[in-house]
Structures are given as C-alpha cells and as structure tokens.
A protein has these predicted regions:
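Residue-level recognition of conserved structural "scaffold" positions that shape functional pockets
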Residues: 110, 127-128
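Extracytoplasmic copper-binding redox domains, predominantly the cupredoxin/blue-copper superfamily
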Residues: 1-114
Length: 133
C-alpha cells in the first residue's frame, strides 16, 4: 500500500478530509480500491514506517470510523493484518485512523467466488498488500 494523491472532483469525498488515498498494488486509481476478503483467509496491508505513522491503516465497522474492528487484527509500525474470522461482519472498511475519507469498503464473503482473481495463487501481493490464504 502506498499513499498517493487525492481524489478527483467527482469523488464523494473530494475536498472532505484527506486529499490522499491508499494505492493498492501500485494503483494510482482516482479512488481508493474496494476489496473482497474471504472468511478464514489472512490479509496484510504493508506500508512504509513513515506512511504508517502519518496514515495509520486500521479496520472499521463503518466508513465514518465510529467503531474500530479488532477481531483477528494485528497492527504494527509497518503493517495491519487481518485473519477474517467466521462471523465477521459482511462489510468492513479500511481507513486512515487520522484522516477522514481515506480508505474504502471491504466485502467479506464466506465462500471463494473467484473474487480478487487479480491476486492469483495462494500468496499474492497487492501493492504491498500481501494476501495469504
């Protein structure tokens, strides 16, 4: 995950909160990337220590960051990792804990529906988001 420039003027969070976003897999897309995670899998968002201290990536139950999600989650100075537990909410959000509107939705599924196929294999890297199954 890298921190890249802001959202375009047609994005819902344009000029609201952070002008930065997380780039997944080297993405410089115009909005934060929505992800799909499978119950029982482990996913790691890896950032440089300077990015993690300036833009700590955390998981939340809501886009407004009212409730942090911590079940199966480990955060260090260089990564945030989640092992998606059975019974996890169907929707989570990865967000910068400091800046508003810097992050996106994670859809949680019980079954592998061929989602995240761009990651491929049993262990894949998304940006430096490492997906371990």
């Amino acid at each position: 995950v890298t921190v890249v420039g802001g959202n375009p003027s047609n994005h819902p969070s344009y000029n609201v909160g952070s002008s930065n976003k997380y780039g997944i897999n080297g993405s410089t897309a115009t909005a934060d990337v929505e992800l799909t995670f499978k119950v029982g899998s482990t996913y790691r968002f890896t950032l440089s220590s300077s990015d993690m201290s300036s833009h700590p990536l955390r998981l939340y139950l809501d886009a407004d960051k009212n409730t942090q999600y911590t079940t199966g989650v480990t955060s260090t100075s260089t990564y945030t990792e989640i092992t998606v537990a059975s019974g996890a909410p169907s929707t989570l959000f990865y967000q910068c804990s400091i800046h508003a509107n810097m992050g996106a939705r994670i859809t949680v599924t019980e079954v592998d529906q061929g989602l995240n196929t761009q990651f491929g294999g049993d262990i894949a890297t998304v940006g430096p988001v490492t997906l371990e199954k």
